[in-house]
Amino acid sequence: MYKRQGQYFLTTHPDYNVAVVSPYYLPEATVTALQEQLAAYGEDCNGDGKVVVKINQYTMAFNSEDSDAYLDMAGTTKLSTDIQSSLSSIFILYDPAGFQQTTGTLRYLDGHLPKSDADSDWWNMVYRWTDCPVLTGMELGSYTSDAVQSASGDSQQLLADYYIGIRGAWLKESASLLENSEPLWANLTAGAVSTAGEGH
């Protein structure tokens, strides 16, 4: 807590950081609902009496000629900082193949770390959003047009095209930072059977 001009501001430190990487920002209503719903499956890791999940959004379209180069560059820079500092451990991805090929960040679903030439094996590192009963069962409501989204619709339908994965820890420093996220990952993927490899 710090004081500023006679007012007190309570700074909230999230227990978990979850990254969303996609060509466009998710609607604000979807992000807010997602943060609240994800928190129900986490623990109070920092002991402040509440469970807080922060969604970090990074916009980039891998291997797309139609994408906004400036947005992509800004998103790439922010994502690189996130990965290097082990900020986010769980990733919600629109294009897991492009993400893994670019970052080499994800681990296998069975917990093993992939070798450096295993990026094309990405489908063994993610679940489809729709593979996970816990995720599809979340009450995420609907979104209306806002600053980032011109359309309106159902948040679950929007996320049905996404995948979810967890990053690997190759260094001791990142391993300790990621340790808190293991129970959350286990809770979110409970009962999931991956269909990401179908068609490969």
Roles of regions detected by a PLM:
Residues S176-E198:
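Surface-exposed amphipathic alpha-helical segments
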Residues M1-Y2:
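Short, small-residue-biased leader/transition segments that mark boundaries at the very start
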Residues D15-Y25:
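Short, well-ordered beta-strand elements
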Residues C45-F62, D68-A69:
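Acidic, glycine-anchored loop motifs typical of Ca2+
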Residues L106-A175:
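A structural signal for short loop-to-beta-strand junctions that line the ligand-binding cleft
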Residues Y24-P27, P96-Q100, W170-L171:
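Solvent-exposed loop/turn segments at secondary-structure junctions
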Residues M73-P133:
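Extracytoplasmic "Venus flytrap"/periplasmic binding protein-like
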Residues E28-V52:
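Short, polar/charged alpha-helical segment
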